[in-house]
Amino acid sequence: MAPPNGTANDVTTTNGSYTNIVGRKTTMHKLIEEHGSILMPGVQDALSAAVVEKTGFHAAFASGYSVSAAMLGLPDFGLLTTTEVVEATRRITAAAPNLCIIVDGDTGGGGPLNVQRFIRELISAGAKGVFLEDQVWPKKCGHMRGKAVVPAEEHALKIAAAREAIGDSDFFLVARTDARAPHGLEEGIRRANMYREAGADATFVEAPADIGELKEVSSKTKGLRIANMIEGGKTPLHTPEEFKELGFHLIAHSLTAVYATARALVNIMKILKEKGTTRDDLDQMATFSEFNELISLESWYEAESKFKSFTPKAES
């Protein structure tokens, strides 16, 4: 498939295939090359990852906002630790082994050496990539107010450190900048290109305000580009086909799953509280058999059947 509009020459070969900044193809590069643009739902835990995989998606995003909500019941306010992120990643990748899992790494856990340790732990946990952002710690969700960013050169060093830690691993490095809100779009674009030069496989200018800003990001940034669709957020919602035409390659729906889960739980709990039973509202839930299929219950019965009895060999 030919590269979509806006792809920079420095990430394509002469036949239109994708490589990373050091000339290797990661799983994510191959997916983008095959499909042109990749729709990547957010996941918050092992169950949501299993749903995404069984629905037929190729990739998923372990969103910090979503993981913080599911694991801690807390907002995306810099409260989630890197240790907790790695723990959540292990569970997510185990539940969805065929998904390309990209992890929200927030600011990377400290300085360049902390970033390197974090990257190695994510690789060990089965992740296929990470987003690293340039916010001041403690960070906030990219669509919340009150954000600040570190000097661009400071984050570029983290990206360079991450690139070194990745080595030959199948791991996709995304550099995110939140500079649009505090300093304007031009600064966000400048930073994205600097982070690309430092070693990022793709760049992500968070929270463009409209189609005009999306077009400007596409025309002025190099390499592969990420867009983030937040229902109720600052960037208007667009389809993957529309983003492909705009020159974006990876489209994250970071919070769709956690928002849908929250709404469904609130609704059914209200029903249970008001009625004292769910007898007349079973259509609001998965059935017993549907859920067992979702969590692959039968495969566990099959595994269990191998160990029903043991017969020792007769002595000669």
Which sequence ranges carry the predicted segments?
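Extended, intrinsically disordered, low-complexity segments
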Residues: 3-22, 256-316
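Alpha/beta enzyme core
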Residues: 17-253, 259-263, 267-270, 306-316
